[in-house]
Amino acid sequence: MTTLKNRFSIKWPVFLWVLIISGMLSACATPTPTITPTSSPTMILETETEEATQTPTALITPTATQADLGNLGNPITLGFILTPDETGAIEAAEEIAVLIGEDTGYAVESSIYPDFQSLAIAAQNGAVQLFWLKPLEYIYLNWEGAAQVVLVTNHLGVYAYGVQFIANIDRGFRSYFDPETNQSTGEVNQALQQFSGTRPCFINSSSIPGYFVPLGLLENASTPTLDPVFTQSYNATIRALFIQGICDFGVTYALNGDPLNDIDIVQNLPEAQDQIEVIWQSEGIIPNINLSASPNLPANIEFNIQEAVLDLPLNPVGLSLLSTALKEEIEAVKTVEDTFYNQLRIAILPLDLDLEAITHNSSTP
């Protein structure tokens, strides 16, 4: 007993010192930091930016298909040259389009242009399918590949009119014209070469029957003349020839009337009917107003429109509407080919005319 007690007494102080020293060491040691998970803001921002800048997929919109020509969404256009103040003619043009539409079943609209230049641009761009043209306007657009004649109108009993050369009988020219048959006799060159070196009375520098055609016929007959006198009217030409000393011969329109029978001449200068004679008269070489079509117009549509216009005279108001819209008395219409214009082309060929300038700047028929 004494031995065990003594052993315990010896070890106990040593144990206490070990505990004290261990406690002191633990208190002096640096505490281990707590590990906290770190967020990744950079990754979140990149993700948000990527989502924000992502380009949305474009929606595919189906392309609208244009309706067939002649349907409501794509009507056939019928061009008229009319000024805005010509309201009666514009209304008549609209009525004509309605009648053609009813006859054919197509959607047809009138298209009004203030001048030929505007219509020519539309025709060349394919913006108008059918249009009414004067003769030089047609020859120009046909040359440009933008017009093909469909129909021609009858005015004052003819589809094409002519020109006549007249003179005072005291001037001594030989007449190559038979008033009984209303036709010329002999060769045109013989008739016209009498005028070589003489002075003509023309109407104005933009008139087809009063300047271009007779001048071209004289050129074709190799007949040079002196500088012309421009009288501005057919009656003035007749008066100048009757008085004499102003010009040696004159020109007027023919076949669709005779200026010598004008009421003014008959009443105020009746002697002119005996004193002024026709030296030579052409055939009908100047066509009246025509209906032309764009060469791009489908043949079946052109034919159906052609037949509908030919039917207009059968309508009680058809010819009246045409006359109002075209601003001249229309008695009938008929189909013609482009060759119908060849005589006019031949007549003006030697003049080398600038048809674009003439048709764009002139309103004289």
Tell me what each language-model feature is:
Residues 70-76, 84-95, 297-365:
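An extracytoplasmic/periplasmic, membrane-proximal ligand-sensing/linker region
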Residues 77, 81, 155-164, 228, ...:
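Periplasmic-binding protein-like
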Residues 132-145, 215-220, 243, 248-273:
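A ligand-binding cleft/hinge motif common to bilobed small-molecule-binding domains
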Residues 153-211, 216-221:
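A conserved helix-loop-strand patch within extracytoplasmic ligand-binding domains
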